[in-house]
């Protein structure tokens, strides 16, 4: 893969670091999501030399989907924070918002495109970009969301930050016994506890 377009599932990658990275600022604020995202993105850029980096952010798409199906994502467990103390629990939501705001601002100073489409989940935006805008371009989707496996084809791969590996259509077929073109249909029959 030479100079692919890299499309990052912003909140998915941020939350991995927010929950796992206990980094603190000099003021005592938790900054693990911010620090981990920036460091991780730097490593990915070194490894894949993308021609373009796009970060897709969530913007309330869940509300739209929940109006159609109230149980949408109701099976999700709350984020498990890797902390050595419990004092930050009431401030977690505020800190999360603060870190995302700092991250968006920092990324706006870099040669990175950020996309936020009103009433759309990042997954939907990523799917549109990979299938329609960059369909004839090599792409790497950065996310641990298996729903995005449906986008994997000859031109598109998925990098899983948790597994630290690039996933292609052969890897999906080998692991699940399902082609990427049938992955979503199979998940409909099997079910998805995270949704």
Describe each PLM feature range.
Residues 2-140, 148-166:
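Noncatalytic, basic helical substrate-engagement surface that gates or grips nucleic-acid strands
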Residues 41, 169, 183:
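Generic structural marker for isolated residues within well-ordered, non-membrane alpha-helices
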Residues 144, 182-195:
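Helix-hairpin-helix
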Residues 172:
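Surface-exposed, charge/polar-rich loops and edge strands
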Residues 177-178:
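Conserved catalytic alpha/beta core of Sir2/sirtuin-type deacylases, generalized to analogous enzyme cores
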């Amino acid at each position: 893969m030479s100079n692919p377009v890299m499309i990052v599932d912003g909140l998915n990658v941020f939350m991995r670091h927010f929950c796992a990275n206990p980094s603190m600022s000099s003021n005592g604020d938790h900054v693990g999501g911010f620090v981990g995202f920036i460091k991780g993105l730097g490593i990915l850029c070194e490894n894949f030399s993308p021609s373009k980096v796009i970060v897709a952010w969530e913007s309330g798409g869940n509300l739209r989907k929940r109006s159609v199906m109230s149980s949408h994502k109701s099976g999700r467990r709350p984020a498990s924070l890797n902390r050595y103390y419990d004092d930050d629990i009431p401030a977690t939501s505020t800190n999360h918002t603060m870190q995302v705001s700092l991250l968006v601002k920092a990324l706006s100073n870099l040669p990175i495109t950020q996309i936020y489409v009103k009433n759309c989940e990042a997954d939907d935006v990523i799917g549109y970009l990979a299938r329609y805008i960059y369909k004839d371009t090599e792409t790497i989707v950065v996310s641990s969301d298996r729903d995005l496996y449906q986008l994997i084809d000859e031109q598109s791969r998925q990098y899983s930050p948790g597994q630290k590996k690039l996933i292609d259509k052969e890897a999906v077929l080998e692991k699940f016994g399902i082609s990427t073109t049938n992955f979503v249909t199979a998940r409909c029959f099997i079910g998805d506890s995270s949704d």
